[in-house]
Amino acid sequence: MTHTLILLRHGESEWNAKNLFTGWVDVNLTEKGRAEAVRGGELMREAGVLPDVVHTSVQRRAINTACLALDAADRHWIPVRRSWRLNERHYGALQGKNKKETLEAYGEEQFMLWRRSFDVPPPPIEEDSEFSQFGLPQYAGLGDDMPHTECLKDVIARFLPYWESDIVPDLRAGHTVLIAAHGNSLRALVKHLDGISDEDIAGLNIPTGMPLVYELDDDFRPTVPHGRYLDPEAAAAAAAAVANQGR
């Protein structure tokens, strides 16, 4: 028996368009991003790959992407479950900063360490920063789990317990699962699924609004490594654009 998993990064956000580090800042989709989300749902419908349940973050750009995609796929009625564990990586003190200006200020090596390394987090955010999430009601119960900054290793550490406790049981029950989330939370899961090394994960870029489908065996490992995009040519072009952010 195989289990179908669909990964969908949110459509272009307002801060994607401005080339800003976003992280946990709760920005909305652009009109382009809304169109990308709708197209993602259309691709699922056209391919006949239709989810029965959705898992998403508590950030509006992912939640709204899920809603728009589901409506386009005529699956607006299925359950949607939200968890902070699917949030984007927290970019610490980089949140709100322009990527190009950060690259120019700190140089290529430091920029790429902060942006794409496995275990080097950016400097921590101050709790009273305008780009901090401390004190927001959606995070009231986190306590010591509330991050000041994260690297990809940290995202994996918070994501995988939810994967095992909530998503795997849905897959095991025979549901087709859609995860509508973020570039780095999805990179964290793909690293786990495909066994990508700590070094090679730096080269993985996930484009906005492009459904990526995995068929998993009974051990929840891919039957075909790296899955398949429902629109592979468009996904490849969009992933290249993600790689060039900051330039």
From Swiss-Prot:
Catalysis: reaction(s): (2R)-2-phosphoglycerate = (2R)-3-phosphoglycerate
Residue numbers binding substrate: 9-16, 22-23, 61, 88-91, 99, 115-116, 183-184
Biological process per Gene Ontology, one example term: glycolytic process
UniProt enzyme class: isomerase
Pathway terms, separated by semicolons: Carbohydrate degradation; glycolysis; pyruvate from D-glyceraldehyde 3-phosphate: step 3/5
EC number assigned by the record: 5.4.2.11
Pfam families, A to Z: His_Phos_1
Enzyme active site: H10, E88
Keywords: Gluconeogenesis, Glycolysis, Isomerase
CDD domains noted in UniProt: HP_PGM_like
GO molecular function: phosphoglycerate mutase activity
Site keyed Transition state stabilizer: positions: H182
Gene3D superfamilies assigned: Phosphoglycerate mutase-like
Described purpose of this protein according to its UniProt entry: Catalyzes the interconversion of 2-phosphoglycerate and 3-phosphoglycerate.
Family: Belongs to the phosphoglycerate mutase family. BPG-dependent PGAM subfamily.
NCBIfam families membership: pgm_1, PRK14115.1, PRK14120.1
Protein name listed in UniProt: 2,3-bisphosphoglycerate-dependent phosphoglycerate mutase
